């Protein structure tokens, strides 16, 4: 029993907490004993306590009044004006409800809060519904009733609001029928039962009345049915007689019209056949024009390819010549730059020497005046020392310059090496990307071989063909590459694929209609430029005579190909001449086969390494290999994927190695630049020291000269002469320097021009190489197009000769025979009746003469049988039928409509009645489970027996301290506390079976002792918190033992005034 009770407690509907429909606050003005009372309620459990007479019960009464209850329904007054406080003229009940969540009542109108305001005066009572802003929305009773039904707030249901009168009534009642009435009303079963019984009674009465009314028209309906049967039969006999006459005339002319139909069909056939002649001839002429145009274009393209090959060879030689000239010009420019810098350095040294001589002249003049014997002696010593230091400094400067030049050359070489390594890295990365792309393509082809011959577009095309397969006379074959394999492994795969090219992507159809259908499928699959070949699928495998094949020991493409489809091999022979394409091992062998042996019936030679060679008259052509791509005709792509993965891994290793070399070169370059900066700094410092010491030495020399009493004027003159000599040398060197600078500019200009010419020529050569490859592809396409056009032209010529013209001749012969037959049939039919009578009968429906003959015989037999049965006049029968039908027609229509409506109502009542019976049984079981579950909290067990037939509800309670183990069947035999607790358990069991956003209980703990009240309160609170509705408990007793909880709100009413 407890298991079922726990199961009910954990019902997710009961556990769902919703804020919609709960009371936020109530305000009473001049209502019963309250002048102005306002109470705010919590969303969960609310306790209202106070002394007797404090107006606790008036709150429940006010709620009942606000929700539309009549005064007598509250059991507190006879009329609503009795609720007005003595001495006042009106009473006001103001209730504020939450209106939030999914169950909100018209939230777009009322908002989050809904207000019910009922004002009662001596003469009137008005209920107003307001929105969350206090604006009046409605004052209609229907709106309030809709609100109450929406939230299921039935204040007369004791499970929603149990007043103190109802509590005492149940406690004092020992009658099982009264308990049943309480249960039946609380679960709303009473209301549903009464409504269904009332409807059932009314339906039975209506059915009985309708049956009586329908019986009154039964005799007349029987007479009408008999008349209708007679009229119908008589009309049918007349129709049959007239039909026989018309059929005989039609039969006579049907022979004529049948021949006319045959003549028309034959004439349409002749016209259709003749329409084919210009169409077919136009196709032949158009294909013939295409063939001639393609032949001219093919000859021009071959000449263009040969010219492009010669031009590309000459371009390569010119490129190499320009590259050598560019290198030579660069070397000359570098040599001139070095010479220019060297001469600039010499001129600067001479200028420095001149400046020193000028300072020396000035110093001599000064020294002459102030020199002494002692100073001259010291100057000589210093002069010797400075001479040694200058020589040493000059030696160090020279060695540092040489070392700096060496480091600079190494740094320049290191920079060029770094650029070369970066270029290598870019080349390897590009190769690796291409290899990875090829690997991905091969893996895709390995999963589905068809994708190798058109990619995803061919898959979409095949699906479109499957969807529209009914449009094709024969299913298309393709792509061709998916239907062929190589016999000797993958050895010749690259050469065969180079020879067949885009032909491997082509599809084959049997006629022009299938070609149009396949093009439509291609457009749907977004497969543009789809190559389609028309070929007769019924044609057997072509038998090629041996003398028509090149006589060589080397294989042809046809000999290395295999296909299960004969049509595919025939197309390869007719379109691509695979029996005339010879395969060779390498360039040398291919050259011997193509140009030296002069084999008959040889068209092209293809080598494994990619060369194509052919001879057309005296012109010998060799096309270079194209960039290698993964072959698509391999039996297995594993080897290619493995080889490409090894090459990609090798390229990755090369990239890593080059990156290591780059890092090493960068480190070396940084070291050289650091060394160069250090050497330059040391050299600059030494040059400064050298200049300073040379000046000091010159000063000392001047001092020595004055000591030897040399003529200062003579020394100064000599120095002036030396300065003039140096200045003249400077002028000569600067003149030479200007000439050298002009030569340097010319060399630089020449180097730049050569470089630009090389780059332009390289770009031009690149374009010509690409143009050569493009021209080769176009040449192959032109050859394929020419062969395809010739095949289609021959196909249309065969159709014209073997099909179109013979069909026209045969159809004309048949037409002449039918014209003679028509003349004979027309002559015979005119004897029976003129053709105008047949036309007057209406349009010809087209039956054959045999069909008409059989129809006439069958109708004659039936007409004979019908004439034997009836002798009345059909007009009299129709008059009698019209009179009787008019008499009862309106009644019958009315009765039928009523019967249909009653049936719909009866079905609905039966469905609801069955559902009510099922719900009764479920509610009875659940009541017992819940009751026993709640009793168990006090150690009591019990049982409830409900009899819907006897309309009784009996309660059995078994006390744990009862040694007799007997159950108490009358609650009046229990103590006051036990009776109140059992009543509470019964009420909670009913509460758990009903829905309502608010519930209230007044003086539920009457007659309870302290222990029973404690258990009852705990039970009530646990139930209320789990159940999820808003609860209001009103009691005059102390509730201090109620545990504190955030969801429990306690309020104390003020004591009544004495």
Swiss-Prot record:
Effect of a null allele: Delayed root growth in seedlings.
Cellular localization per UniProt: Nucleus; Chromosome
Nucleotidyltransferase listed as a keyword: no
Tissue spec: Expressed in seedlings, rosette leaves and floral buds.
Keyword Coiled coil carried by entry: yes
InterPro entries listed in its UniProt record: P-loop_NTPase, RecF/RecN/SMC_N, SMC_hinge_sf
Region of interest called Flexible hinge, as start-end residue ranges on this chain: 450-633
Residue stretches in coiled coil: 136-449, 634-927
One GO MF term attached to the UniProt entry: ATP binding
Assigned GO CC terms: chromosome; nucleus
Domain Zinc-hook: from-to ranges: 23-1049
The entry's keywords: ATP-binding, Chromosome, Coiled coil, DNA damage, DNA recombination, DNA repair, Nucleotide-binding, Nucleus
Subunit and interaction comment: Forms a heterodimer with SMC5. The SMC5-SMC6 complex is composed of the SMC5 and SMC6 heterodimer attached via their hinge domain and from the non-SMC subunit NSE4A or NSE4B.
Family that this chain belongs to: Belongs to the SMC family. SMC6 subfamily.
Name of this chain's protein: Structural maintenance of chromosomes protein 6A
Gene: SMC6A
